[in-house]
Amino acid sequence: MLTINVTIEQMRSMVRISHTKLDDELGMLKEAYLTDLSMSGVNTIPTDDMLSLATLMLYLRWRENYNGEADRYEKAYEAAKISMSLASEYSEVPTV
């Protein structure tokens, strides 16, 4: 199962909110993001990987329709996801 090292505070910052009312939703969106990456062939996320954090930000902004620009964020997210799925550092199966 994929994991990403990101706090709820970081996710709030990604969508530029400071309240806690959306914390549960942000947590669910994070899990949906990881599932989407996994279904696209991403098998591992390196520790402290900035591309995966930037891609998560795009995903959250798409799903939350940030500034009414969901289409723009969806296209950017899909492009980043494809890049990750094609890169060897994300497709290697982690050893347990």
Regions found by a protein language model. Give the residues of each.
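Short, functionally important structural connectors and interaction interfaces within domains
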Residues: 9, 37, 74-76
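Short loop/turn elements at secondary-structure junctions
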Residues: 14, 20-22, 29, 47-96
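Short, intrinsically disordered N-terminal pre-domain segments
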Residues: 1-15
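Structural recognition of short helix-loop-helix hairpins that underlie histone-fold modules
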Residues: 12-22, 34, 38-45
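Short, functional N-terminal and low-complexity linear motifs
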Residues: 1-4, 24-28
